[in-house]
């Protein structure tokens, strides 16, 4: 198993580790409920160095990005970030990514840990002229500081002018470590928060700085367990659950990130040709129980789909789930098969949780 630069430190702090996407990663510290609550009400710190990073540079970089990704990047200015899907020729989802514009000829793409090798191979195979791709994952570490008090922790570390004001924006900051760090106002928790990218040889020093700054605010160390419950409440899709290579991109409720009016991109023809037959919905269980991943979903007595992600929501105190089901079904009599029992469920709007701004 691979290890992030923070693995030894987090073991010393009592992290319980699991194998995730080939990495030895902490699933929890004091407990998932404690960590989840900390992020919703205060602030939490995550090691997310398992994520992959790919640089695209050159005069053809923007054209390549326009070809590879479903969103439109012609309007993306330096210092801004934009979410997108990357599709195969059949319209299936290769990955979902964040694209950072460092300059019109330099882009930084954050990809899912389980897909780094696949993504780099796909990107490399579809480069347009005057574009170079480089996988910088092995040399990049990342910490996420998330929650209402994240901004106060960040203010103890960075000058005000170096802190990105808007969501989905970032700054490059010199002087904190040996090399520049990238401070991004992004996250995967449905809260305000920041993600800090740095060189691996600066990672331990960065952790010490952030951890010390967080003491005043009782910042919690958080693992992948809380990250999952937080993103699920925010209805944020997870690759391998809500989407994969076989999932038609138009069936997952992310059409706002698919710009069919822009010039050709990989998978566009397939999306125009194929009508969606599935949909992603949010449900809340009426009967007592928890709808876990892969549980069958029924409309009346008809099997119509399955649960892609489900949990007992720590914030809402209700069993919630995202489901992938047939399109145009009658949702008035939904149920989920949980260990042989049909539990009644109702469709609810997504996201399940939205922070008060």
Language-model segments: residues:
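A subset of signal/propeptide-processing and intrinsically disordered low-complexity segments
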Residues: 42, 90-91, 223, 228
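Short coil/turn segments at secondary-structure boundaries
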Residues: 52, 56, 89, 94, ...
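Acidic, proline/glycine-enriched N-terminal capping motif
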Residues: 1-84, 92
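Internal amphipathic helical hairpin motif
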Residues: 59-93, 151-179
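Conserved, structured C-terminal
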Residues: 1-21, 25-29, 102-357
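Glycine-rich, Trp-frequent "lid" loop and neighboring beta-strands that shape
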Residues: 98-99
């Amino acid at each position: 198993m691979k290890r992030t630069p923070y693995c030894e430190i987090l073991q010393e702090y009592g992290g319980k580790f699991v194998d995730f996407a080939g990495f030895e990663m902490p699933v929890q510290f004091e407990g998932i409920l404690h960590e989840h609550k900390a992020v919703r009400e205060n602030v939490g710190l995550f090691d997310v160095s398992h994520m992959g990073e790919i640089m695209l540079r050159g005069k053809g970089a923007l054209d390549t990005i326009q070809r590879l990704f479903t969103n439109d990047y012609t309007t993306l200015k330096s210092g801004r970030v934009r979410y997108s899907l990357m599709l195969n020729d059949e319209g299936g989802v290769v990955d979902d990514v964040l694209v950072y514009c460092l300059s019109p000829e330099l882009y930084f793409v954050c990809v899912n840990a389980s897909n780094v090798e696949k993504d780099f191979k796909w990107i490399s195979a579809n480069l347009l002229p005057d574009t170079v791709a480089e996988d910088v994952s092995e040399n990049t570490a990342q910490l996420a500081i998330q929650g209402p008090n994240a901004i106060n922790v960040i203010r103890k570390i960075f000058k005000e002018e170096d802190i990105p004001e808007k969501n989905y924006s970032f700054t490059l900051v010199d002087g904190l470590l040996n090399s520049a760090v990238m401070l991004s106002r992004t996250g995967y928790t449905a809260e305000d928060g920041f993600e800090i990218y740095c060189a691996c040889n600066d990672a331990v020093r960065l952790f010490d700085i952030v951890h010390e700054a967080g003491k005043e605010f009782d910042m919690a160390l958080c693992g992948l367990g809380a990250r999952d419950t937080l993103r699920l409440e925010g209805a944020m899709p997870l690759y391998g659950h809500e989407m994969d290579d076989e999932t038609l991109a138009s069936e997952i409720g992310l059409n706002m990130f698919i710009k069919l009016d822009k010039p050709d991109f990989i998978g566009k023809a397939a999306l125009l040709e194929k009508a969606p037959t599935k949909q992603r919905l949010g449900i809340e269980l009426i009967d007592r129980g928890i709808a876990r991943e892969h549980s069958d979903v029924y409309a009346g007595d008809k099997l119509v789909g399955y649960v892609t992600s489900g949990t007992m929501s720590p914030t809402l105190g209700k069993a919630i789930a995202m489901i992938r089901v047939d399109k145009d079904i009658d949702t008035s009599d939904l149920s989920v098969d949980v260990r042989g029992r049909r539990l009644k469920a109702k469709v609810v709007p997504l996201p399940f949780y939205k922070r008060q701004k």
